[in-house]
Structures are given as C-alpha cells and as structure tokens.
Design a protein with these regions (language model features):
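Catalytic core of bacterial c-di-GMP phosphodiesterases, primarily the EAL and HD-GYP domains
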Residues: 24-34, 61-137, 211
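Active-site core of bacterial EAL-family cyclic-dinucleotide phosphodiesterase domains
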Residues: 1-55, 92, 153, 210
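Catalytic-site-adjacent helices and loops of nucleotide signaling machinery
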Residues: 45-49, 58, 153-166, 190
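Cyclic nucleotide signaling catalytic output domains
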Residues: 3, 51, 55, 72, ...
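The catalytic core of metal-dependent phosphodiesterases that act on cyclic dinucleotides
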Residues: 110-184, 198-211
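Conserved long alpha-helical elements within nucleotide-processing catalytic cores of c-di-GMP signaling
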Residues: 53-54, 63, 138, 142
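The cytosolic transmitter module of two-component sensor histidine kinases
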Residues: 1, 66, 100-103, 107, ...
Length: 211
C-alpha cells in the first residue's frame, strides 16, 4: 500500500497505460484499443494488475489513479485518431470512480484538453460496479451515455455479469470473458454459449466483443 501511495505521490511513477488492439473479426482491421494499466514497482518490479488494482479500490487510491488512467488513455487516443478518425479507446472505470461527483466533469475536461470526441471513447465496467448502490451506478452510466460515450459490459458470463444485469444496464457493447473464448475450438459448450450471447445481443442492438 505504501509503495502504491509513493508512486501516486511522485506523479504516478511506475504506472503505464498500454493499448491492446481490438480488431474486426471478419476483416482483421483495427477497430480500436483497450487501455490496460500496468505498474512497475521500484522495489519488486512489475506487479500484476490482479494484485494491485484491488488494493487501489479498497484504499480509495483508485480515484486519483483512475483519473490519471482516463486522461492518459484519452491522450493516446488523440494520437491514434490522427491515423484513424474512427478509432475507439475503451477505458475501464471502477465502482469507486462512479461515486465521485467530479468524475463526469473530469471526462469532459479530458476530452476537451486532448481534442477527442465522445464517439471515440468507450467506458467499460466490470462486476464490481454491481455489488451495491446500483441506482447511483446506473444513473452515472446514463449520464455518460448522454455525452455520446458508449458503455461496455466487461467480463460477461462471470460473477455478477448475468442476463439480469444485461437487461437492466444501458450497455451498448458486451465483452464476453476470455474464459469462454480460449477453448472455443474444442468446447462445444463455449461455442454454444458465445453463439447464444452474440445472437441475443445483436437482436437487441448490442455490439459484442470477444476477449
């Protein structure tokens, strides 16, 4: 915890945002990218996000780090749209960030600062957003969508990401968890599950992304 705090205090030293490409399944052309947070600790070297992100969320440090990640991701997006105006950057947002009253205005300021349009940004959320305070979370998502930013449900098929949540949440994109994708060639269940979710989403106007 102290090492994370020191990194934040020293202008987010050791933190980096990597961009993982997202491609169209039919053509292989790049559609956009997902912003991935990485941290290299001075004392222990690279630390897995599985280890440090829960600590950030538990301690509340995710608020400043989340804003830094969002702004850095928008900055990277601004560079990408110079080559592809339709490039879309997907940025993960935590439950804690959605409870921050200043976060929505921060989104506007970040996009304005880097000259990025709402159509180029996608906000992703995970199951942690639905542990409690659903009303506040859903309202935040609606306000984000009103800006013209699309909402993506991450890790669908695991944890709290159920059909019930899909029905309630104003999601524009569903990302099927890699647990169902990695064995798609050998698992009949995984193929059937993916086919079902894809057809269901397309029938109601929701895009699908396979991780």
């Amino acid at each position: 915890t102290e090492l994370l705090h020191d990194s934040i205090k020293h202008n987010f030293k050791g933190f980096e945002v990597h961009c993982q490409p997202q491609v169209y399944a039919d053509s292989g052309f790049i559609k956009g990218g997902e912003a991935l947070l990485r941290w290299k600790c001075d004392e222990y070297g690279p630390v897995s996000p599985v280890e440090f992100i829960p600590i950030l969320e538990k301690t509340g440090m995710i608020a400043p780090v989340g804003k830094w990640v969002f702004d850095e991701s928008v900055r990277i997006c601004a560079k990408c749209i110079k080559y592809n105006p339709d490039f879309k950057m997907s940025i993960n947002v935590s439950y804690v960030q959605l409870l921050d009253d200043s976060f929505l205005s921060f989104i506007d300021k970040s996009m304005h600062r880097h000259g990025v349009l709402a159509k180029n940004i996608i906000v992703e959320f995970t199951e942690s957003c639905f542990i409690e305070e659903r009303g506040i979370v859903f309202e935040a998502f609606e306000n984000i969508r009103k800006k013209g930013i699309k909402i993506a449900m991450d890790d669908f098929g695991t944890g709290y990401s159920s059909l019930e949540v899909l029905k309630e949440v104003p999601a524009d994109i569903v990302k099927i968890d890699r647990a169902f994708v990695k064995n798609i060639r050998t698992s009949n269940f995984d193929r059937t599950f993916i086919k079902f979710v894809v057809e269901l989403c397309h029938d109601v106007g929701i895009e699908v992304c396979l991780e």
